């Protein structure tokens, strides 16, 4: 992939605040550093809840949410963007992968006191057809055990489990809480201890 970069070179001499890559810095209402000028989408930054900073993550989810907020605010409302976790997913052949929050590399670059755990499990019970391996990685605060990020990979059900992790990170859940989280169980869909429960329980 060639990657994405903001097409904002025409703003170079306007004085508008931008990141080094040209992304327009905005606040939680979509306002730029120039009064009455708003921005949203792949040209603008988003606030990352874990990094606690304005970052460039050009995703359709972020663009749509901020577009709605900017539109509402231009119409006289006072709506605020609650922040992103950079949740994303991909399908390659028969494999799917999802990520949310920060990666272990991010944690290192941020000089966080963190721990990580990696587990291999199955997506559901062995007596139902379609059982596949599933892999979960968690990054969490070493002191508080608050979950900071995670990735899930497998042939089936990886992305939806990533959505659960996104909810857990947004709610500032700990690994202990994830380990005991009451998730749905039926033999075709999960095991009595879901892979996410297991990942939480081994994160000490």
Describe the role of every protein-language-model region.
Residues 1-69, 164, 168-171:
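FAD-site-proximal beta/loop scaffold in flavoenzymes
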Residues 2-4, 42-43, 88, 93-94, ...:
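Glycine-rich beta-alpha junction loops
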Residues 17-21, 77-88, 113, 117:
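A short alpha-helix-loop-beta-strand transition element characteristic
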Residues 21, 85, 102, 133-135:
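Short beta-strand-initiation
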Residues 26, 40-103, 188-204:
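A conserved FAD-binding loop/helix module that cradles the flavin
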Residues 29-30, 89, 128:
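Short secondary-structure boundary/capping segments
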Residues 95-100, 109-204:
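Flexible, glycine-rich terminal cap/loop adjacent to redox cofactors
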């Amino acid at each position: 992939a060639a990657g994405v970069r903001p097409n904002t070179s025409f703003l170079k001499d306007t004085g508008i605040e931008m990141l080094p890559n040209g992304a327009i810095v905005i606040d939680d209402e979509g306002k730029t550093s120039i009064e009455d000028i708003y921005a949203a989408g792949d040209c603008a930054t988003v606030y990352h809840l874990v990094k606690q900073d304005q970052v460039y993550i050009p995703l359709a989810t972020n663009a749509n949410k901020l577009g709605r907020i900017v539109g509402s605010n231009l119409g006289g409302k006072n709506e605020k963007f609650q922040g992103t976790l950079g949740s994303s997913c991909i399908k390659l052949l028969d494999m799917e992968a999802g990520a949310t929050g920060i990666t272990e590399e991010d944690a290192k670059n941020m000089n966080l006191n963190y721990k990580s755990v990696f587990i291999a499990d199955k997506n559901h019970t062995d007596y139902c057809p379609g059982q596949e391996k599933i892999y979960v990685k968690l990054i969490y605060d070493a002191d508080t055990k608050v979950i900071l990020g995670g990735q899930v990979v497998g042939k089936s059900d990886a992305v939806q489990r990533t959505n659960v992790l996104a909810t857990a990170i947004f709610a500032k859940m700990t690994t202990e809480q994830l380990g005991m989280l009451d998730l749905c169980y039926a033999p075709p869909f999960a095991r009595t201890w879901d892979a996410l429960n297991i990942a939480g329980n081994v994160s000490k």
